[in-house]
From Swiss-Prot:
This is Large ribosomal subunit protein uL16. Pfam families: Ribosomal_L16. It comes from Caldicellulosiruptor saccharolyticus (strain ATCC 43494 / DSM 8903 / Tp8T 6331). GO terms for biological process: translation. Binds 23S rRNA and is also seen to make contacts with the A and possibly P site tRNAs. Belongs to the universal ribosomal protein uL16 family.
Amino acid sequence: MLMPKRVKYRKQQRGRMKGKATRGNFVAYGDFGIMALEPGWITSNQIEAARVAIARHIKRGGKVWIKIFPDKPVTRKPAETRMGSGKGSPEYWVAVVKPGRVMFEVGGVDKEVAKEALRLAIHKLPIKCKIVSRQDVEMGGEVNEGV
């Protein structure tokens, strides 16, 4: 499970997800990737489930890059606890994802295998995504044609 080794502050406010991704919005390492189409929080368990789905499908060929990291703690109070008496303790970690962000990349496998592996991974994620290739995405992050 992904999480930071140490953080300066244990608890964070929820924050807002405004606008599009300005960083990590193109396929940098592999040939194909998963691009987010809507904002959301991706938990470390969801990232791991998607990684396992990709790894199982591509078997020993190819390489997988995870381009997001869960660095935001989400707190939760115990069940049947009265309101008040402070903020709950950190329960799990999430990565904040904005539209246009490329979250996973796959390289070193043929087109059909890569697309099927990424399709399986998309089903593990809680937001709408699409499969993009290196040719589809310019350096600016704008998608020319849907794959």
